[in-house]
């Protein structure tokens, strides 16, 4: 083994070997239990971020554990075509490089261009996945637009249409006026904005008056331009101010339209004036109110979000309607929406109908890709009827076929699924799965797997012209089929039989509805077991939190606080990090602040920590709470942990290589410490496996850390030294054998979390361990608890030995006694502890650096001593001649004064009403905790003074 641990030199070559040897593949023995995980397919445009690294570490740890249990494991890998994101990347590329738009290319040539881009640049994320040590089966890599998945998508669409679960309708969607497409709620970012609330007077028709004698009512709005499309005003039916007006009309200013006043719970009596203008074609809440009261829908905007020359009027079912005229005032024709807002407010003011304008904080929806304000827009789109599909999907979670970890996320899932809306699945893009629907010139629609099939099924002559729907399917539609589409469906393949349903889905809470719920609905509708029972896509959904920065803020390019996992593996210098965080920014004005913060936080850039340290940190932080604040200090700590394991392994090798390790015929004797470390290992194996089974990777990592660092390195290796130096041959064989076998088992136990370092060390020690065969640690067995190796007595006895040694070390530190000075020690002990002392004398003398140790006779007088309790015994160190009494008292007086000063300072802080009133609860609690600590220290110091004064 190399002298120092250098992850850079071992990781990439090792991964290449694993992949080339086919170790990541299922072993194919179907008589053994199978285990599968389908990776959430990352966007093909993407690069690996901390969220991916976190979830991939969790998945890889789980898959490596199950592979080492001998299961037939598949970790299915693949990428998502990411419709809108990919199309925009390529549009920007051709604009920058060729000054062209997609329209200059035309649809087919532009799509070819995207495929070309995918071939060149689409592999970034899969390369990075390899760097993480992800043991996915690369030979089975899939893409959501490959032939097999495209076939599955088409099949699902056609069957859903035939089952009357897909329809085309005119409904309200999130419309991106820049990208000219419908987008999902997940692609809408609500930004806090300072805006205004305009209060308009709407005159009452037919001489009607309000309860207080006014001939108008006042409505409040944050979007004045939409009033051109108003078809009603809502008041709360319980509101005494307006009850008499329900059923009456108002005359809408500017457009002179007569619209009704309706009673609806949507109007909040406490909010604003209690009267709400209703624009069903341009607001999601109003759309629902409009449906409840059969109010016509008037669309006033073009797809660019300019005012139309003539409005479009529809019934609540989206059919054309003549309930109102289509005229809009000429001066607004073609006007941009925000310019129209200003002009309409000015016209209300001129008409004397602007009651007041108030400052108002509101959330404005922006498209996260196009960066412009989203408009709710009435458009023709394709929809899935989700209610019938949701019923089965809810039952699967209710009856435990699918379990959420943590369980609280089931409630989030239920609340969505019990109030599920129809799902808009069409997008006005070119890149994606084109909708398999064709139209004739009369507007009749035909759905089928191909134009030939459509003509055949509907007896359409070749003279009848058909044109395919221009739209593509929402990316979530194809990714909803991920668990079964990747395994060969609609064919009934062996893979589908063996690996479906998958065992666990690891995902974020933000896509439980968009992806998880839809996978459950689609899978259960299309995949049935041999008894015809709907199959679930996965048995467990493990929901992770978000990884935030050290201050708890979300990582984002605009905040400049994004950490790239690869930079933590390989390291990055400060200038490159600053450039990375400030280059190509959407908002360049933020660059200076980001640069300042980056230089402050990472003075020397980021050093190379290696993959294992990163993985261990991610695992150790994977508690099942919501969010995780990233901490570079923990990463550094876990790199030190890897280093410690490396150095411990070198110590083991130096003491076992070319030595008799007790695998031959020679006599063998195991020390108490040998039996103790074996027992500690069994406890660690039991705890590790339990934690993995319960998805508590944080506790599993902690178990490894605690065992390797504290028990194996800090204690056991120390306890072996007296035996290796002075023990008999039989004792040395026993200890060498224990050293090498426990290390080998430990490497296997830790391998799923830190694969590279464990494989590297294992390859070096493998020849020293009897009976270990095989080319890689990956395919060795994962240690399980073995009662036969567990010895409670050895555990208790060594805990006593540890307590004895620790007490001596603590007393040396407390009384400032030179750590190397041999001490005389006396023990007031019962029979059991006296026997322990006798049995372990050699180890205690060596590790505690003692001159002598003896048990006191009953009633024996003792001189002034420093004392400590060890179990039921009292340990004593006679102090005479050990220290300079006056110097030690002077030192202690200084410590006492310093501690009293701290106590006074904190008491003053906590006694200050201003501080207590303003400071957060957590800060106050921390100060109280500090105070308690100082008070305990003071009591100890006084005790030490008394002991020394008595000498």
From Swiss-Prot:
HAMAP family: Val_tRNA_synth_type1 (MF_02004). It comes from Vibrio vulnificus (strain YJ016). Its EC number is 6.1.1.9. This is Valine--tRNA ligase. Catalyzes the attachment of valine to tRNA(Val). As ValRS can inadvertently accommodate and process structurally similar amino acids such as threonine, to avoid such errors, it has a 'posttransfer' editing activity that hydrolyzes mischarged Thr-tRNA(Val) in a tRNA-dependent manner. It comes from the Bacteria. ValRS has two distinct active sites: one for aminoacylation and one for editing. The misactivated threonine is translocated from the active site to the editing site. One of its GO terms (molecular function) is aminoacyl-tRNA deacylase activity. The gene is valS. The lineage of its organism: Bacteria, Pseudomonadati, Pseudomonadota, Gammaproteobacteria, Vibrionales. Monomer. ATP binds at residue 557. It is found in: Cytoplasm. GO terms for biological process: valyl-tRNA aminoacylation. Belongs to the class-I aminoacyl-tRNA synthetase family. ValS type 1 subfamily. A motif ('KMSKS' region) lies at residues 554-558. A motif ('HIGH' region) lies at residues 42-52. It is an enzyme of class 6 (ligase).
């Amino acid at each position: 083994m190399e002298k120092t641990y250098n992850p850079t030199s071992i990781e990439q070559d090792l991964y290449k070997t694993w992949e080339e040897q086919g170790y990541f593949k299922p072993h194919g023995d179907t008589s053994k239990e199978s285990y599968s995980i389908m990776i959430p397919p990352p966007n093909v445009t993407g690069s690996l971020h901390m969220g991916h690294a976190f979830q991939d570490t969790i998945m890889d740890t789980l898959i490596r554990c199950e592979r080492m249990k001998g299961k037939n494991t598949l970790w299915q890998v693949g990428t998502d075509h990411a419709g809108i994101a990919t199309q925009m990347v390529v549009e920007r590329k051709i604009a920058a490089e060729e000054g062209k738009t997609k329209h200059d290319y035309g649809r087919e040539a532009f799509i070819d261009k995207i495929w070309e881009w995918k071939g060149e640049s689409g592999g970034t994320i899969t390369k990075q996945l390899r760097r993480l040590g992800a043991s996915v089966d690369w030979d089975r890599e899939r893409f959501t637009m490959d032939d097999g998945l495209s076939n599955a998508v088409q099949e699902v669409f056609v069957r859903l249409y035939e089952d009357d679960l897909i329809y085309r309708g005119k409904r309200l969607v999130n419309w991106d006026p820049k990208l000219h497409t419908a987008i999902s709620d997940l692609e809408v970012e609500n930004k806090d904005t300072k805006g205004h609330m305009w209060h308009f007077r709407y005159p009452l028709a037919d001489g009607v008056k309000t309860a207080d004698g006014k001939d108008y009512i006042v409505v409040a709005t944050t979007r004045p331009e939409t009033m051109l499309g108003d078809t009603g005003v809502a008041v709360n039916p319980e509101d005494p101010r307006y009850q008499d007006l329900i059923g009456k009309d108002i005359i809408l200013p500017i457009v002179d339209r007569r619209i009704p006043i309706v009673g609806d719970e949507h109007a909040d009596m406490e909010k604003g004036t209690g009267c709400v203008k209703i624009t069903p074609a341009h607001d999601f809440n109003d759309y629902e109110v409009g449906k409840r009261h059969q109010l016509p829908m008037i669309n006033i905007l073009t797809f660019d979000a300019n005012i139309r020359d003539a409005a479009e009027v529809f019934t609540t079912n989206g059919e054309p309607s003549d309930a109102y005229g289509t005229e809009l005032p000429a001066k607004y024709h073609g006007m941009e929406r925000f310019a129209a807002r200003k002009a309409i407010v000015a016209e209300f003011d001129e008409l004397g109908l602007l009651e007041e304008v108030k400052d108002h904080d509101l959330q404005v929806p922006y498209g996260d890709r196009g960066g412009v304000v989203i408009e709710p827009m009435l458009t023709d789109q394709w929809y899935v009827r989700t209610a019938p599909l949701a019923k089965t999907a809810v039952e699967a979670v209710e009856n435990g076929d699918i379990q959420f970890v943590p369980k609280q996320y089931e409630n989030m899932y239920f609340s969505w699924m019990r109030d599920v809306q129809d799902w808009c699945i069409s997008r006005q893009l070119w890149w994606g799965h084109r909708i398999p629907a064709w139209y004739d010139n009369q507007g009749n629609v035909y759905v089928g797997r191909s134009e030939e099939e459509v003509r055949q099924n509907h007896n359409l002559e070749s003279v009848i012209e058909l044109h395919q729907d221009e739209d593509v399917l929402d990316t979530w539609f194809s990714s909803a089929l991920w668990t079964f589409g990747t395994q060969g469906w609609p064919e009934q393949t062996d893979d589908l039989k063996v690996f479906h349903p998958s065992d666990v889905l690891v995902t974020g809470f933000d896509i439980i509805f968009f992806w998880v719920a839809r996978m459950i609905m689609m899978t259960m509708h299309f995949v049935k077991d041999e008894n015809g029972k709907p199959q679930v896509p996965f048995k467990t959904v493990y929901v992770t939190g978000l990884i935030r920065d050290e201050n708890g803020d979300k990582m984002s390019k605009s905040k400049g606080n994004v950490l790239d996992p690869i930079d933590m593996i390989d390291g990055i210098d400060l200038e490159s990090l600053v450039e990375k965080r400030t280059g190509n920014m959407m908002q360049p004005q933020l660059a200076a602040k980001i640069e300042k913060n980056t230089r402050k936080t990472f003075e020397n850039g980021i050093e190379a920590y290696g993959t294992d340290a990163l993985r261990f940190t991610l695992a150790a932080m994977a508690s099942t709470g919501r969010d995780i604040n990233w901490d570079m200090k923990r990463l550094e700590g876990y790199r030190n942990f890897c280093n410690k394991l490396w150095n411990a392994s070198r110590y083991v090798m130096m003491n076992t290589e070319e030595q008799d390790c007790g695998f031959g015929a020679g006599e063998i004797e195991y020390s108490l410490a040998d039996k103790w470390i074996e027992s500690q290992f069994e406890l660690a194996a039991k705890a590790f496996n339990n934690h993995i089974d319960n998805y508590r990777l944080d506790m599993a990592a902690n178990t490894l850390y605690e065992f390797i660092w504290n028990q194996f390195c800090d204690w056991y290796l120390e306890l072996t030294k007296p035996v290796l130096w002075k023990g008999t041959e039989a004792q040395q064989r026993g200890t060498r054998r224990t050293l090498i076998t426990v290390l080998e088992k430990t490497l296997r136990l830790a391998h799923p979390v830190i694969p590279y370092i464990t494989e590297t060390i294992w390859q070096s020690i493998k020849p020293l361990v009897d009976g270990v065969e095989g080319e890689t640690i990956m395919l060795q067995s994962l240690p399980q608890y073995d009662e036969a190796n567990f010895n409670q007595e050895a555990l208790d006895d060594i805990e006593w030995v540890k307590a004895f040694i620790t007490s001596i070390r603590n007393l040396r530190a407390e009384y400032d006694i030179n750590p190397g000075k041999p001490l005389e020690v006396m023990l007031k002990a019962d029979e059991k502890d006296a026997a322990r002392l006798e049995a372990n004398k050699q180890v205690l003398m060596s590790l505690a650096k003692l001159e002598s140790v003896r048990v006191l006779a009953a009633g024996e007088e003792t001189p002034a001593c420093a004392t400590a309790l060890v179990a039921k015994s009292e340990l004593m160190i006679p102090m005479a001649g050990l220290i300079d009494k006056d110097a030690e008292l002077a030192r202690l007086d200084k410590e006492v004064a310093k501690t009293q000063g701290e106590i006074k300072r904190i008491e003053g802080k906590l006694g200050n009403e201003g501080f207590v009133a303003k400071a957060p609860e957590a800060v106050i609690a921390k100060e109280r905790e500090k105070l308690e600590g100082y008070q305990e220290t003071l009591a100890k110091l006084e005790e030490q003074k008394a002991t020394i004064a008595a000498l």
